Structures are given as structure tokens and as C-alpha cells.
């Protein structure tokens, strides 16, 4: 399904349209998370706020593999536009939501569209450009993905503070409108597609299993206890339908996920790395702002700005990884990535309340640089040397596993951080006596340290104990995250000797 657009001057407008789509999709969840406090204060229903994120993520992840396969079968353009229109419709509706129930429903609509944007955009780049140019373009796209993920919290805080939470959603409308125009007007795709049978059995069993798993992970420990009937029931249904999915896929003529791809060593390792990187990178975006706000006493907006060095590092890493794809093996570039990521995480894990913010900036630059490589290299590795009719499936699998890793990482590491914080706080307070001890026992929610006005009224002895407990719990999580990074390092060694071959090299090989 190669497009001729790569030879057309209008290709630059297609690229802009795709970049805008990635910008919205990657930024959406983090930008909304920043505004959730204000949204709850306005709409009420605190007990339902977790569903705002859960409903969107479930819809996105359930759609990713389906869109990837359908784009292979019937073309990229129509499904990218379908996703874009649904995303814009959902965004506009979210902005006018009058209740939490409405917002949750509209987030589902937004998520149905969002699941198409990221995987199909990366796939179109491979269709548009020859091998020697794909690296540069995937580096650019990976940079925008990394930029969007880190920019979300900052932009969300600024919009919520200076305008209103509604514009966290409305901002997508003009961006998406430009993307829609550029893709409709300039993306010329071949209309020659074979009529193929849709794997409805695989689609249904996969969607049901993903929906159950995602709801269990998103709501467990928040809305329901992990041992509750609801969560156990969701995990049980997930297991049943996931097993059914495997059985159905083995017999399907055109399976949603082609498991034969995992026999390719480069493809298989790229999927494992996407999952591991997703699960570890996200904790930096989540916990560094918390560290800055709780330990350093910075404002929410300032905490958002603190991620800028990591953003710059990831952009640089993504661009370098993309540019050198045709010159070095995937394995060699990912070794640089995983070493940088490991060093950065190790340094972050050794921080204390006395660590200067300048050093935090350096540590984030190192971490972001390492992670940035993965944004451009892993999608490219997933689609390397694959026939064009399998690219959508390959890249959607990679995007799905990265997103799944992010969800799992936030859930697991978030639970660990909360438990460690509570344990250390209890131990710390138990040894306090006198007026400070009484103040500690009478204190309400320790999370009050996030609020500047309340923080100033907490006795210094109590405040210092809370800060130390918070710092220790977050750095404990960073040190624990070294485990999946080490697993990633071992996985990288099995990537083989492949690299992106230029057009001339492929012609010489076939000729």
C-alpha cells in the first residue's frame, strides 16, 4: 500500500497534519489529569473522577489493534480521518459537559477517535517516505510524541489557571481542524485494496478482554479495593476472553494481531521494549512534579515547568535516534538509550530533600535523552522490512504495548509509592512527642503539603517528617524502576544486527 505522496511537494502538509494529530493524542491524557481537581470542584461527583481517565484509556487501547488491522486492509486515510473526527467531536462535547456522567461518556467518544491517531500516523510516514528518509521523519514524530507527553501537565496547569478547564478540551478543536484540512486536501493514497474478511471474532474477544483489563487496572485501589468482587470479576472475564482471543486468532484468515510477526526477533524485542519503556518513562512524568511540589514546595504550574529539561532531552534523543537509523544497528542505538535511561533513573533514585534543583535538571536531561531514542527507534524497528500491508498491524501493536505499559506502570508504581509513603509517615510520626507529636496526630490529610497556604501552617518538625517520607517514597519507586530498565537492557542485546537499509542497498541486494 505504498503511496506516491513522498514524491509530491504537498507531502510537507501531510506531515504537518499527522504531527498535529500526534500532538493532540499524546498530550490529551496528561493535560486532562492536571485539570481534574478543578473539574471535580466544578462538576462534583468526586467518587467518579477516576472514570474520566479510565473511560478514555479503555476506548483508546481497545481501538488501537483494530484500527491498525483495518488500515492495512482498507487504507490509512479513511481511518485516520475517522479517528480525527471522533476525537474532535468528543473534545467539543467534553468542553460543554454539564455533569461528570456526561464528561465520562464524551471521553469514551474522544477515546474511540484517539485510538486511531498515533499508530496510523506513524504508519503513514513509512508509506510516504523511502527508507533513507524514514529515520529523520520518525525522529521528528518521536520528538513530537515525547514533547506532547511532557508538555501536557504544563499546558493543562496554565490553561486551567488562566482560562478554564473547558479549554483543556476546546484547544483540540482548532488543532484538529488544521490536521483534518491538511490530510483531506493533500494526502493522496492508493485506492487499490484487496477485499478481505474482517476477523469479527478476534475483534470482539480482544475488545472485551482489553476493556475488562483496563477497567480493573484503572479502578482497582481507587474506586474499588483490589480484592473486591468487581475487580476480581473484571480480571476473570479478561482472562477468559483473552484465552478465547488466542484460540480465535490461530484459526482466523486475517487475524487482528498476526502472531507470526513475533517470530521475527527484531519485532519481538521492539514490542517488549515498548512495554518496558512505557511503564518506566511514565513514572518520571508523574512523580517528578509531585516531588518538586511536595518536597521543594513549588506551585503546580512551576512543577509542570520542571519537566522541560526531560522534554528537551527526549526530543534530542528522538532526533538522534531517527537520524542514525540507517548508519547504525537498532541494537547499538538502543544500547546508548538504555544506558542513558539507567544512569538518569539511578541518579533520580538517589535524590534527597537537599538535592539542588540544578542537579534534578541534569538528571532529567539524562533520563529524557535515553527515553527519547525509543520514541523513534521502536516504531521503526517494528515495521522494518515488513510488507506494507502489515505495517498498520505492526505499529498499532507497538503503540498498544507502550500504552499498556504506561497504564500498568502508573498503577503498580503508584500503589507502591502510596504504601511506602504511608508506612514511612507512620514510623516517623510514632516517634514524635510533645507539641509536635500532638500536632502530627491531629493532622488531617498529609497531602496538605501540596497547598502553599496550608503548608505554611504545619509545624516545621511535622512538615520535615512529611517531606522526608514523601521524598523517600518517590526515590524508592525510581530505584525500583531500575529492575524493568535492566530487563530492557538484556532485551536490547537480542535485537540482532539489523538496521534500516537505504533504497540503494535494497536495490543492490535484489539486483
Question: How would you label these PLM feature ranges?
Answer:
Residues 3-8, 180-207, 222, 250-265, ...:
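Flexible interhelical linker loops that connect adjacent transmembrane helices
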Residues 11-64, 68, 144, 164, ...:
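Transmembrane core module of solute transporters
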Residues 22, 84, 88-91, 106-107, ...:
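A generic transmembrane-helix signature of 12-TM secondary carrier transporters
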Residues 39-40, 70-71, 155-163, 217, ...:
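Interfacial helix-cap and linker-helix signal at transmembrane-aqueous boundaries
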Residues 64-202, 219:
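Helix-loop-helix hairpins in multi-pass membrane proteins, especially solute transporters
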Residues 141, 151, 360-438, 493:
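Small-residue-rich alpha-helical segments with characteristic i,i+4
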Residues 174-191, 207-219, 237-251, 488-496:
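C-terminal membrane-cytosol helix-exit motif in multi-pass small-molecule transporters
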Residues 403-494, 502, 508-511:
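Hydrophobic transmembrane architecture of multi-pass small-molecule transporters
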Amino acid at each position: 500500500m505504498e503511496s506516491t505522496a513522498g514524491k509530491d511537494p504537498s507531502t510537507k502538509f501531510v506531515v504537518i497534519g499527522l504531527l498535529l494529530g500526534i500532538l493532540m493524542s499524546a498530550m490529551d491524557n496528561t493535560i486532562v489529569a492536571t485539570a481534574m481537581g478543578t473539574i471535580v470542584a466544578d462538576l462534583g461527583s468526586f467518587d467518579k473522577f477516576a472514570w474520566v481517565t479510565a473511560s478514555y484509556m479503555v476506548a483508546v487501547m481497545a481501538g488501537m489493534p483494530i484500527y491498525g488491522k483495518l488500515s492495512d486492509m482498507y487504507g490509512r486515510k479513511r481511518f485516520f480521518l475517522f479517528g480525527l473526527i471522533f476525537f474532535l467531536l468528543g473534545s467539543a462535547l467534553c468542553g460543554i459537559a454539564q455533569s461528570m456522567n456526561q464528561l465520562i461518556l464524551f471521553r469514551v467518544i474522544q477515546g474511540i477517535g484517539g485510538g486511531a491517531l498515533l499508530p496510523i500516523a506513524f504508519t503513514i510516514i513509512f508509506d510516504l517516505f523511502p527508507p533513507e528518509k524514514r529515520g529523520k521523519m520518525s525522529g521528528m514524530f518521536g520528538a513530537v510524541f515525547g514533547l506532547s507527553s511532557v508538555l501536557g501537565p504544563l499546558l493543562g496547569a496554565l490553561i486551567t489557571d488562566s482560562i478554564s478547564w473547558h479549554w483543556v478540551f476546546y484547544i483540540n478543536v482548532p488543532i484538529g481542524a488544521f490536521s483534518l484540512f491538511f490530510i483531506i486536501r493533500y494526502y493522496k493514497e492508493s485506492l487499490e485494496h484487496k477485499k478481505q474478511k474482517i476477523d469479527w471474532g478476534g475483534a470482539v474477544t480482544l475488545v472485551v478482554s482489553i476493556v475488562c483489563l483496563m477497567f480493573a487496572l484503572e479502578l482497582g485501589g481507587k474506586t474499588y479495593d483490589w480484592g473486591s468482587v468487581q475487580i476480581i470479576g473484571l480480571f476473570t472475564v479478561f482472562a477468559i476472553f483473552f484465552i478465547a482471543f488466542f484460540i480465535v486468532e490461530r484459526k482466523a484468515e486475517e487475524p487482528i494481531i498476526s502472531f507470526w510477526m513475533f517470530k521475527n526477533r527484531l519485532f519481538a524485542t521492539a514490542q517488549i521494549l515498548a512495554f518496558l519503556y512505557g511503564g518506566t518513562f511514565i513514572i518520571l512524568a508523574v512523580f517528578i512534579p509531585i516531588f518538586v511540589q511536595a518536597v521543594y514546595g513549588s506551585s503546580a504550574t512551576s512543577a509542570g515547568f520542571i519537566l522541560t529539561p526531560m522534554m528537551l532531552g527526549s526530543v534530542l534523543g528522538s532526533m538522534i535516534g531517527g537520524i542514525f537509523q540507517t548508519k547504525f544497528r537498532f541494537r547499538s542505538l538502543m544500547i546508548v538509550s538504555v544506558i542513558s535511561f539507567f544512569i538518569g533513573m539511578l541518579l533520580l533514585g538517589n535524590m534527597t530533600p537537599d538535592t539542588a534543583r540544578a542537579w534534578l535538571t541534569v538528571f532529567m536531561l539524562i533520563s529524557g535523552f535515553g527515553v527519547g531514542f525509543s520514541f523513534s527507534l521502536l516504531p521503526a524497528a517494528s515495521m522494518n522490512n515488513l510488507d506494507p500491508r502489515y505495517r498498520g498491524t505492526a505499529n498499532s501493536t507497538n503503540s498498544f504495548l507502550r500504552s499498556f505499559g504506561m497504564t500498568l506502570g502508573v498503577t503498580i508504581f503508584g500503589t507502591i509509592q502510596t504504601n511506602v509513603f504511608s508506612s514511612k509517615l507512620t514510623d516517623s510520626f510514632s516517634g514524635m512527642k510533645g507539641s509536635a507529636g500532638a500536632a502530627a496526630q491531629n493532622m488531617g490529610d498529609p497531602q496538605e503539603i501540596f497547598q502553599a497556604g496550608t503548608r505554611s501552617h504545619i509545624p516545621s518538625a511535622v512538615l520535615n517528617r512529611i517531606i522526608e517520607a514523601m521524598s523517600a517514597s518517590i526515590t524508592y519507586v525510581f530505584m525500583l524502576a531500575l529492575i524493568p530498565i535492566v530487563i530492557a537492557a538484556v532485551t536490547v542485546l537480542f535485537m540482532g544486527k539489523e538496521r534500516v537499509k537505504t533504497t540503494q542497498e535494497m536495490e543492490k541486494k535484489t539486483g
